[in-house]
Amino acid sequence: MNQVEMTEFPVGKPQEALYGVASTPDGALWFTLAKGNAIGRLSPDGAVSRFPLPHADGQPTTITCGPDGRPWFTLSSANAIGRLAPDGALRMFELPRPASRPFGIAGGHDGCLWFAEMAGDRIGRITIDGDIEEYDLPVKGGYPSCMAAGRDGLMWFTLNQAGAVGSISATAAPRIFPLGAADAAPVGIASDAQGALWIAQAGNGAIARFDAGGRITEFPLHSRAARPHAIAADAAGNLWFTEWGANRIGRISEAGDLAGYELAAPGSEPHGIAIDPHGCVWAALETGRLVRLQASPRD
């Protein structure tokens, strides 16, 4: 792989808790400011726009590009799902049951958005028109966290406190699959081109591969304290992830080869991660910056 060039873009203040990031087809990066109570947009020309949210403490967290090409995001404290149009027009969809604390969100093969309810022990599904369905999980206190669309047509999710992953669809009941390590504390999840799922295990500092046959392979990182958090797949077969506890961005190939890239400033606290249409990797740093990683020719 070519050398990696890292560039940082200031988009917020440290006290605003920059958290999630997503790319839309127009090349823009959208991000959440969990304590700034706003959604931001970094345009391809470098301009930064902010869209304040109506709740005083909505806590926008995870964000994704929906099937309609627009950014969709969860508001954990406001108990809602939000959607923004390119011109900043906002729509909010409150969840049917209070204090569900939605967190992870991802587009599904069915043209809907699926989200995890941390405190509700449920997975939710919302159409682009705002119709919501909820599905109870068979595990209580599992802390459903992040979502990903699998190549098998199912939606997959992590259960942070249960040390497990699960699958679901609108017609298939939820199934739960324990991971190999009791202290895994899985957070991020992504699917590769071969149909395998890759899981960021924050608890034991490892990336796990869950293949189509249900086999689990664990790849320990350089430190158990690395606390891998979010993970995303690129078109070249690599999985990129944030190491919240180690101040790095990590990469693992489908063969299990690991690499890591140190961030410029100590204590950057990387959280969300996304791949843009050009194949560049973007991560959200709690210091109020987005960092872009792109391949550069060798010297």
From Swiss-Prot:
The active site is at 271 (proton acceptor). Substrate binds at residue 229. The keyword Magnesium applies. Its EC number is 4.2.99.-. GO terms for cellular component: outer membrane-bounded periplasmic space. Belongs to the Vgb family. Its cofactor is Mg(2+). It holds the Pfam family Vgb_lyase. Keywords: Antibiotic resistance, Lyase, Magnesium, Metal-binding. Monomer. GO terms for molecular function: carbon-oxygen lyase activity; magnesium ion binding. Inactivates the type B streptogramin antibiotics by linearizing the lactone ring at the ester linkage, generating a free phenylglycine carboxylate and converting the threonyl moiety into 2-amino-butenoic acid. The keyword Transcription regulation does not apply. SUPFAM superfamilies: Calcium-dependent phosphotriesterase. GO terms for biological process: antibiotic catabolic process; response to antibiotic. It comes from Bordetella bronchiseptica (strain ATCC BAA-588 / NCTC 13252 / RB50). InterPro entries: Streptogrm_lyase (IPR011217), Vgb (IPR051344), WD40/YVTN_repeat-like_dom_sf (IPR015943). Mg(2+) binds at residues 269, 286. This is Virginiamycin B lyase.
